[in-house]
C-alpha cells in the first residue's frame, strides 16, 4: 500500500483489494487476495462483503472475485 492519510485506512485497504482484483490475470480467490494484500482474514472478508454490497466487486459461483458492475461503470 501507499502512504495512508490519517482516518482513511479502511478506504485505502478497500482500494488495495480492488486493485488486486483488477490486476490479477485470472479472477483471484480469497486465498489469492490474502497473499496479495497482506490483510488478516477477517479484515479481507469484511472488505469483500462491503465491496460486494456496494456492487464494486462480485463473487463468482467458483469463489473467485471480479470487478462489480458499479466499478466497471466508473
Report residues per predicted region:
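N-terminal helix-turn-helix
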Residues: 1-74
Amino acid at each position: 500500500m501507499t502512504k495512508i492519510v490519517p482516518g482513511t485506512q479502511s478506504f485505502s485497504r478497500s482500494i488495495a483489494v480492488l486493485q488486486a482484483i483488477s490486476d490479477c490475470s485470472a479472477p483471484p480467490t480469497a486465498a489469492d487476495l490474502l497473499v496479495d494484500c497482506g490483510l488478516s482474514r477477517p479484515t479481507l472478508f469484511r472488505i469483500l462483503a462491503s465491496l460486494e454490497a456496494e456492487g464494486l466487486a462480485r463473487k463468482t459461483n467458483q469463489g473467485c472475485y471480479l470487478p462489480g458492475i458499479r466499478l466497471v461503470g466508473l
